[in-house]
Amino acid sequence: MAHKQIYYSDKYFDEHYEYRHVMLPRELSKQVPKTHLMSEEEWRRLGVQQSLGWVHYMIHEPEPHILLFRRPLPKEQQK
């Protein structure tokens, strides 16, 4: 799978977390489990590449090809 077909959003923030979403090509999205959130090992196996600390935190039912990730902000950046 060519990684250039995977789209990575810009990061966005709230008081506690930074977020990003990752859009998979439709064919690749068929490999996303429907019963659980993916571990880092699972999403890396799909070809998603991002730095350490990101957690797949929510399944977006209407668009399962969009993976939602978050990671805690460093304590000094939290409000």
UniProtKB/Swiss-Prot annotation:
Belongs to the CKS family. Keywords: Acetylation, Cell cycle, Cell division. The keyword Cell division applies. GO terms for molecular function: chromatin binding; cyclin-dependent protein serine/threonine kinase regulator activity. The gene is Cks2. Gene3D superfamilies: Cyclin-dependent kinase, regulatory subunit (3.30.170.10). One of its GO terms (biological process) is cell division. It comes from Mus musculus. It comes from the Eukaryota. Binds to the catalytic subunit of the cyclin dependent kinases and is essential for their biological function. The modification N6-acetyllysine is found at K4. This is Cyclin-dependent kinases regulatory subunit 2. InterPro entries: Cyclin-dep_kinase_reg-sub, Cyclin-dep_kinase_reg-sub_sf. SMART domains: CKS (SM01084). Forms a homohexamer that can probably bind six kinase subunits.
